[in-house]
Amino acid sequence: MGRYVIRRLLQMIPVFFGATLLIFLMVNVMGDPIAGLCGDRQCDPATAAQLEKEFGLDKPVWQQYLTYMGNVFTGDFGTAFNGQEVTELMANAFPVTIRLTLVAIFFEIVIGISLGVLTGLKRGHPVDTTVLLLTLVVIAIPTFVTGLLLQLLLGVKWGWIKPAVSTDAPLDELIVPGLVLASVSLAYVTRLTRTSIAENKRADYVRTAVAKGLPRHRVITRHLLRNSLIPVVTFIGTDVGALMGGAIVTERIFNIHGVGYQLYQGILRQNTQTVVGFVTVLVLVFLVANLLVDLLYAVLDPRIRYA
């Protein structure tokens, strides 16, 4: 296991550099960030030259990237164009988005897997058909429509929640935004769990467990569910980074000042330091999540061993 982890960590190094280089190049072709600072009016040439020198934009792109990566390994993600350190923005934004993501993952696991097990065991029954139709409707509706609808009904019309989340984003105010963020993924987890349960319940090891006279709940939890969760864990593991980076719409609707909000502001203002810095951390989240998912396979299925 130790050798496998070391090998995976070494494989993550070129992936990390390749992903950050790609993001760095994409952000640099968005436009001239100095022109974005000046707004509608044209920048004074002397002022523009001074700003380019201050932020290192007067150097070739490859040199900017090497300088940036060198600073990253010392914990310096640069300075935003408003003079604020990017690490300071991260310290304020990431805790909020992490809480929002944890709420979303909770809904995915509890509701998604529960409905998937229920429909997988009752495949072909009316409850199975109903849940499948509901998940299809959820997948078909865009996230911003779901968010605006719940905000209007629960927050504005009925007054059950605050229409906008407070600045400190307490956990109780993130329940509805977390449900909105998790809605589409929850539907996919339900359908994925259902398919996996329906296929594995006909497997030989399940029939053997039933033939031995094991209680039904033990057959489901210890044998059927454990082996059926492997594709679900894969989806949820990769979805962690997607939820953190894809929360832009949800955070905009509920006025949550998290990672999505900072990315939106960075892209809108062509603030390359902010965008590249936040995406660099999200790349690390993706890589670590994938590694943890691979290690979790061996826990769920004892037949899987890593040399």
List where the protein language model places each region.
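Alpha-helical transmembrane segments of integral membrane proteins
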Residues: G2-Y4, N92-V127, T143, T167-A307
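N-terminal signal-anchor/signal peptide hydrophobic helix marking the start
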Residues: I6-V15
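Residue-level recognition of pore/gate-forming positions within transmembrane alpha-helices
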Residues: M12, T20, C43, I109, ...
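Small-residue-rich alpha-helical segments with characteristic i,i+4
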Residues: V15, K122-V137, I141-T143
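Hydrophobic alpha-helical transmembrane segments of membrane transport/permease proteins
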Residues: V15-L66, W158-V176
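Membrane-water interface segments at the C-terminal ends of transmembrane alpha-helices
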Residues: L22-M30, G56, G70, L133-K162, ...
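Membrane-interfacial helix-loop-helix junctions in multi-pass membrane proteins
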Residues: E52-W62, D76-G83, T87, P163-L171, ...
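An internal, D/E-rich "acidic patch" concept
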Residues: L57-I113
